[in-house]
Amino acid sequence: MAEERNFRKVRRGYVVSDKMDKTISVELELRTTHPLYGKVVRSTRTVKAHDENNQAHVGDLVSIMETRPLSKTKRWRLDSIIERAK
């Protein structure tokens, strides 16, 4: 009997740095509702993602997927490039 893989998180964000080899920095926008006032509060988080072929560049809108730890700070990998930078 084959084991099924657990659900993996998928996020969308913009590439803010591609200066590292096989690694990109992606800025994710988090939207949360304030518990008392109900206002939607936007905040950002920057994560590092694995880009095996160095195909993503600064400004690209990308989809990243959660994966096993690849290094001290990398826990995401590039899933697809949704839109290229203009």
From Swiss-Prot:
GO terms for cellular component: cytosolic small ribosomal subunit. Belongs to the universal ribosomal protein uS17 family. GO terms for biological process: translation. It comes from Bifidobacterium animalis subsp. lactis (strain AD011). PROSITE patterns: RIBOSOMAL_S17 (PS00056). Keywords: Ribonucleoprotein, Ribosomal protein, RNA-binding, rRNA-binding. One of the primary rRNA binding proteins, it binds specifically to the 5'-end of 16S ribosomal RNA. GO terms for molecular function: rRNA binding; structural constituent of ribosome. It holds the Pfam family Ribosomal_S17. This is Small ribosomal subunit protein uS17. The gene is rpsQ. It comes from the Bacteria. Part of the 30S ribosomal subunit. SUPFAM superfamilies: Nucleic acid-binding proteins.
